[in-house]
Amino acid sequence: MIQIIYVASPESQQIHVWKLDSIYGLLELIQVIYTHGQAQPMAVHPNKRFLYVGIRPNFGITTYRIDQIGLLADHGTIGIFSSPTHLISDKKGAFLYCTSYRNNTVSVIPISMSGMLLDSPIQIIEGLLGCHSANIDKFKKLLWVPCLKENAIRLFNINSFGMLTSYDPSIIKINVGSGPRHMIFCDFDCYAYVINELTSTVDVIKYNNFQKIPSIVQTVSIIPKNISINRCWAADIHITPNGRWLYCTDRSINIISCLEISKKTKKLKFVGYQLTEEQPRGFAIDYQGKFLVVAGQKSNCISLYKIDSDNGTLTMLSRYSSGKGPMWVSIITLNCK
């Protein structure tokens, strides 16, 4: 079994492919590919055989086939009508959902049985102001779309054809001025965690199949009390697979914050932070919850950290140059024969 890290660097129009050496805490560069423009959001097909990459300024999505050792091969690009901000596949790998912060849209793009994207979206929903990401909960029935400029999360039903219709209620209101951006779901219970870009906070949302209206049960800051900050600029959020530790980045003070998730209530407690790369735009956690890889958009480097399973502390293991403006990080596990 091997772990592969993909890092998209739009300024150099590259994707760097790294292999994780979990014994020595090192990354080995195994491939650099040049993209058809500024590569930004990435999404991996559930079968781990395809990587989808959003491209700017000529808006498109490129499909890359992933071979048995993680190397990428270009399998074509489709044009789309909006600037891609975030991509996610449904759990069956039949549809790709693409949000556009700039164009305020969510597009639904069919994926063929062969893994290729069809020529154009089958549905485009407009008027989602500052929609930053698309997210599918554990029941696989709802698409959650944080809309930064609305201070809200829009909810959509996903039907059997992948199409979206408004859920009732169709919106979760977030605190004014928060700017919801990215989110993650707890795999062991019905809780969602939303990072707010403009206040550097995380909202904890309780939901389930029978509770019609999801509700915010906690809002917690990711900024340490001993650090003064002139501007909040939170970016990314992820949870370890065991559901115990939640990590967030803030680009204004270049930190990764660690919060502990209560086993009983699923609420958060701030436990510490790690100074990291300049402008930590994106990061990812491996499938065992042992390693974290973060990209510095301004430092042009990525750092590999070891996660302490007992207290959530991060320890830097190694650091590497990874093109210009690295933003997106994806980690996959492959069964290598």
Swiss-Prot record:
EC identifiers of the protein: 3.1.1.31
Q: Which reaction does it catalyse?
A: 6-phospho-D-glucono-1,5-lactone + H2O = 6-phospho-D-gluconate + H(+)
Alphabetically sorted, this entry's keywords are: Carbohydrate metabolism, Glucose metabolism, Hydrolase
A Pfam entry, by short name: Lactonase
A GO biological-process term: glucose metabolic process
Cite a single GO MF annotation. Answer: 6-phosphogluconolactonase activity
Query: What's the superkingdom here?
Result: Bacteria
The biological pathway it contributes to is: Carbohydrate degradation; pentose phosphate pathway; D-ribulose 5-phosphate from D-glucose 6-phosphate (oxidative stage): step 2/3
Q: Which GO terms describe its cellular component?
A: cytosol
Against InterPro entries, the record matches this protein to: 6-phosphogluconolactonase_YbhE (IPR022528), Cycloisomerase_2 (IPR050282), Lactonase_7-beta_prop (IPR019405), N2O_reductase_N (IPR011045), WD40/YVTN_repeat-like_dom_sf (IPR015943)
Instruction: Give the enzyme's main class according to its UniProt record, as a single word.
Output: hydrolase
The free-text function statement in the UniProt record for this protein reads: Catalyzes the hydrolysis of 6-phosphogluconolactone to 6-phosphogluconate.
Family statement drawn from the similarity comment of this UniProt entry: Belongs to the cycloisomerase 2 family.
Which protein are we looking at? 6-phosphogluconolactonase
* Species this chain originates from: Blochmanniella pennsylvanica (strain BPEN)
Give the organism's phylogenetic lineage.
Answer: Bacteria, Pseudomonadati, Pseudomonadota, Gammaproteobacteria, Enterobacterales
